[in-house]
Amino acid sequence: MQELGKVESNSIRVTRQDDKRITIEKDLDTEHMVLSMGPQHPSTHGVLRLECITDGEVIVEAEPYLGYLHRCFEKHCENVDYPGIVPYTDRMDYLAGMNSELAYCLTVEKLLDIEIPRRVEFIRVITSELNRIASHLVAIGTYAIDLGAFTPFLFCFRDREHIMNLLEWISGARMLYNYIWIGGLAYDVPADFKKRVAEFVTYFRPKAVELYKLLTENEIFVKRTKGIGIMPADVAINFAWSGPMLRGSGVKWDLRRNDPYSVYPELDFEVPVPDGKFSDVGDCLSRHLVRALEMEESLKIIEQCLDKMPEEQGFDPRALIPKKIRPKAGEVYGRAENPRGELGYYIVSDGKSTKPVRCKARSSCFVNLAAMKDLSKGQLLPDLVAIIGSIDIVLGEVDR
């Protein structure tokens, strides 16, 4: 690495590399300090504890401690029938319940080998993309407030409220929806669904541009995030990263494009990745940038779905839902692109029971958080807040 700055004295040599990591060589025999960050800390986005070993203000190692929000999700699934698991999935990533429900239902439908009505497919994608935008607004708003910018937080939650009202109008709930069911939906959308969703798209498009100018192009925000927590593409792949974290490292991988499901093969949209002109590829700013740009792509997807969604009088989205779900014996893995990455479910059926023998959830947040040691080593302690915020973790999904 190229050395950007070097300070020497008789007893200490401090070097800052081009990725802003700091190395300290010294002749003094000093002890490292151990700092416990969390489990109740404003920047941890939930009950996460980090044990940080520091050399002065430089992080030597940051070890995450998990499990404070463990609720036995996978064990509960063994004692609940297949449809009864849907509400539990809402409570994993509670900021993206529609996406969590979709991933689970796709997996069971794959095991049952059933076909879903086209109208249902389009409604599922529209509600999931609305939820994706709402989730990214939380990620961006809370990231801003982590770094001391309060106004963008208010802008994000102002616009998110429009989506929450829409989803409540469609499903009856603001966060824990229980709307996407195996084989269909809980019920059809209201009569003026297309009109209200189209109005939101028209409203939000200039607001997304406004937010980009307010925060992403803000000089102070750029200084706090550019070059911090760099993760090279090959290392990100080895850690099995996915979602905005992987795309922030320059890898163009999105399950909606690379392993498409539902009606995504029929839709035209881009997969944003940083080009290195505005940010250093793989840094905190790149990960934020991907989320900011993805919101516009979600708007494009919603518009196309509104145009293509078939109108059906007297449509019953529950008509194809079997009253008793008893899949054939076998196992299946299904996955979908959640706002934080690949959310997958591995389900085992014995062919006799209406309950799964095993239901394993693959959490993107858990996998992304596993790289915390590599991301934080050599960084300054104040930059740890920027690194945690850039991961966009939801501890309900991490701990399950």
Swiss-Prot record:
Biological function: NDH-1 shuttles electrons from NADH, via FMN and iron-sulfur (Fe-S) centers, to quinones in the respiratory chain. The immediate electron acceptor for the enzyme in this species is believed to be a menaquinone. Couples the redox reaction to proton translocation (for every two electrons transferred, four hydrogen ions are translocated across the cytoplasmic membrane), and thus conserves the redox energy in a proton gradient.
Membrane topology, from the record: Peripheral membrane protein
Upper taxonomic lineage: Bacteria, Pseudomonadati, Chlorobiota, Chlorobiia, Chlorobiales
InterPro entries: NADH_Q_OxRdtase_suD, NDH1_su_D/H, NiFe-Hase_large
Main location: membrane
Cell compartments where the protein resides: Cell inner membrane
Reaction catalyzed: a quinone + NADH + 5 H(+)(in) = a quinol + NAD(+) + 4 H(+)(out)
Name of the protein described by the UniProt record: NADH-quinone oxidoreductase subunit D
EC number: 7.1.1.-
Pfam families: Complex1_49kDa
Family classification: Belongs to the complex I 49 kDa subunit family.
